[in-house]
A protein has these predicted regions:
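Nucleotidyltransferase catalytic core that binds NTPs
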Residues: 1-158
Length: 158
């Protein structure tokens, strides 16, 4: 698995991936269903963020992650992920509008062909973009989008 730590300077040979996007802080069954929907004709990638946005916005909060970035990368590699885009969640990324995130990061930067997110996915400054917004913005730029239904475990969404 190739690891990429920014959305800029991505090699042309890496562009065109089909990605699952989210925090994947535990890589549980719900995450795996999102990843499975991203599998297809294009190489499989993951777009995730480090640190977790919650750690960026509330660094004083107690630790909550089920696995650190290294354990997450190892788990994703075992699931057959070919490209891990572990984007730096910093003030620059946090300030992007949903439109700028799709245009600058997903389209111009990573050059993805397909993105899959969970139905509860939020993105952009102030979490102002929804999964539906992502689909609308991506489709306008030629990026196929799939919104995965939430997975339940004993009646509880995970």
């Amino acid at each position: 698995m190739q690891q990429h730590f920014h959305w800029q300077g991505i090699a042309p040979s890496t562009r065109g991936t089909s990605v699952a996007m989210g925090n994947f802080d535990g890589v549980h069954r719900g995450h795996q269903s999102v990843i499975d929907l991203a599998r297809g004709a294009a190489p499989l990638g993951i777009v995730t963020f480090e640190p977790h946005p919650r750690q960026f916005f509330a660094p004083q909060s107690p630790a909550f992650r089920l696995m650190n970035a290294e354990a997450r990368a190892n788990r994703l590699a075992r699931l057959g992920v070919q490209h891990l885009f572990q984007l730096p969640f910093d003030a620059t990324l946090a300030s992007l509008t949903p439109e700028a995130f799709v245009n600058d990061v997903l389209h111009d930067g990573l050059g993805i062909s397909h993105v899959v997110v969970g139905a509860d996915f939020c993105f952009g400054k102030g979490r102002s973009g929804t999964a539906r917004d992502l689909a609308t913005l991506c489709e306008a730029r030629g990026i196929r989008t799939t919104i995965a239904a939430l997975v339940a475990d004993n009646g509880t969404e995970i």
